[in-house]
């Protein structure tokens, strides 16, 4: 009996330790973002595989003149995965009217031991039928100007001039984004 009590205590502490590790990871990423940096960018084109972006703000310049839904997510994030069908539907419905959905995977900078990581992104895109641009960031400074320290999914709605008009933390129904899109197109 004395052996089960320490194991039971350890099992009760495990979720707390996991939660603490996630909070620390978010704080570290948020702090690194606030430090700025990373001014180089690569040309970004729509691709069936993720493209590395060294600076999200510079990469977004390719979409000036379009309304952009910019979603920060990860393959291992359950709430993020819940929103993907909505983003697929929005891209299908509004692409020809000037909408661009862009997903930014933070998998490459996820905490060690996380089941995601850069190798998980391309297969995830294919198996989920993602029809919109996916960028990956390989360093926290690439997120400069976008705060994801409160958690993911974090989604920004940008107008045609590239200005942020809405920010959402957590899952939102498709109707919320449709309302934003319709007011901006």
Question: Model-predicted segments: where are they?
Answer:
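Conserved redox-active cysteine motifs that mediate thiol-disulfide chemistry
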Residues: 72-89
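A short beta-strand-turn-helix
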Residues: 47-68, 91-94
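N-terminal targeting signals for export/organelle localization
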Residues: 1-54, 167
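Thiol-/selenol-based redox modules, centered on thioredoxin-like
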Residues: 151-185
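Short, internal strand/loop/helix patches
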Residues: 118-156, 160
């Amino acid at each position: 009996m004395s052996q089960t009590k320490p194991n039971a205590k350890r099992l009760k502490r495990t979720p707390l330790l996991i939660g603490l590790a996630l909070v620390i990871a978010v704080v570290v990423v948020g702090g690194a973002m606030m430090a700025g940096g990373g001014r180089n960018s690569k040309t970004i084109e729509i691709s069936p595989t993720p493209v590395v972006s060294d600076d999200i703000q510079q990469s977004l310049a390719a979409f000036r003149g379009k309304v952009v839904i910019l979603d920060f997510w990860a393959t291992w994030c359950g709430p993020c995965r819940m929103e993907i069908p909505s983003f697929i539907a929005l891209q299908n419905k509004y692409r020809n009217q000037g909408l661009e959905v862009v997903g930014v995977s933070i998998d490459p900078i996820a905490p060690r031991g996380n089941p995601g990581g850069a190798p998980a992104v391309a297969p995830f895109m294919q198996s989920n039928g993602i029809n919109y641009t996916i960028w990956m960031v390989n360093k926290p400074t690439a997120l400069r100007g976008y705060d994801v320290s409160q958690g993911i999914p974090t989604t920004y709605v940008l107008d045609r001039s590239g200005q942020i008009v809405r920010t959402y933390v957590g899952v939102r129904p498709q109707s919320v984004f449709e309302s934003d899109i319709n007011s901006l197109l």
